[in-house]
């Protein structure tokens, strides 16, 4: 299940649960789509990428 994070979250700057990456679009996850590129926070949550 995805949850909002970063600039798009309420409150802004919210981190993802369980240390997941916050994508550039403000969604939490652990795949390359969330953790690479312009990831907002916790971008090293999946070091195998």
UniProtKB/Swiss-Prot annotation:
Keywords: Chitin-binding, Disulfide bond, Lectin
InterPro entries reported for this sequence: Chitin-bd_1, Chitin-binding_1_CS, Endochitinase-like_sf
Disulfide bridge positions per record: 5-22, 16-28, 21-35, 39-43
SUPFAM superfamilies: Plant lectins/antimicrobial peptides
Gene Ontology MF, one: chitin binding
Misc: On the 2D-gel its MW is: 10 kDa.
Protein name per Swiss-Prot or TrEMBL: Chitin-binding lectin
Organism: Viscum album
